């Protein structure tokens, strides 16, 4: 809840301070910021996987992913978050509007359609949001988000760290969630 409040306050403050961006600038900024987040988080998780395996990566995520996301937001002057319908951390649960987009993208995948690289949406309140799909495209992702044996040390660590976890059972090419960048 605290993270949502901080996201909302930062979002409103950024709207009041910044000059309006053009659509092209929003696309460019959204692409840059989301790519930076994916790279920073991915590099950290890769290091954790190499040095301590999936459990180390899980602990890194639980302790650092939100603050790393906040750091990227602060550095970029945007509001950014990662969301999913099948979230691991309840803080990353998609809103009603975000679920609608994720469900639309799920339907596209089910019909063998290609997902857009991004979606730029103007909300009813006049604000614009950049959405970027997160697709499982690396075997390493499946170590923590694939089919996890119920009695494995990793499954136990996930359950201890995230009692409400819903983020397993994915396959290569599945939609994991999306990155949301607000302007």
Residue locations for each model-derived region?
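Sec-dependent signal peptide recognition
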Residues: 2-10
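Hydrophobic h-region of N-terminal signal peptides that target proteins for export
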Residues: 10-18
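Extracytoplasmic c-type cytochrome modules immediately beyond a signal peptide or single-pass transmembrane anchor
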Residues: 18-140, 149-183
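Short, cysteine/histidine-rich loop/knuckle motifs that typically chelate Zn2+
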Residues: 143
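Short Cys/His-rich local motifs and their 1-3 flanking residues in nucleic-acid-associated proteins
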Residues: 146
């Amino acid at each position: 809840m605290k993270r949502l409040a901080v996201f909302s306050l930062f979002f409103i403050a950024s709207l009041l301070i910044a000059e309006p961006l053009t659509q092209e600038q929003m696309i460019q900024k959204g692409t840059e910021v989301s790519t930076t987040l994916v790279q920073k988080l991915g590099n950290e998780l890769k290091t954790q996987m190499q040095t301590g395996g999936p459990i180390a990566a899980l602990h890194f995520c639980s302790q650092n992913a939100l603050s790393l996301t906040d750091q990227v937001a602060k550095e970029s002057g945007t509001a950014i978050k990662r969301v999913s319908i099948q979230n691991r951390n309840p803080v990353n649960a998609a809103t009603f509007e975000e679920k609608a987009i994720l469900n639309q993208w799920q339907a596209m995948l089910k019909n063998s359609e290609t997902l857009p690289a991004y979606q730029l949406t103007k909300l009813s309140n006049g604000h614009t949001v950049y959405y970027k799909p997160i697709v499982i495209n690396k075997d390493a992702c499946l170590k923590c988000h694939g089919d996890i044996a119920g009695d494995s040390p990793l499954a136990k660590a996930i359950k201890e760290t995230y009692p409400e976890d819903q983020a397993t059972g994915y396959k290569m090419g599945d939609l994991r969630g999306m990155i949301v960048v607000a302007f």
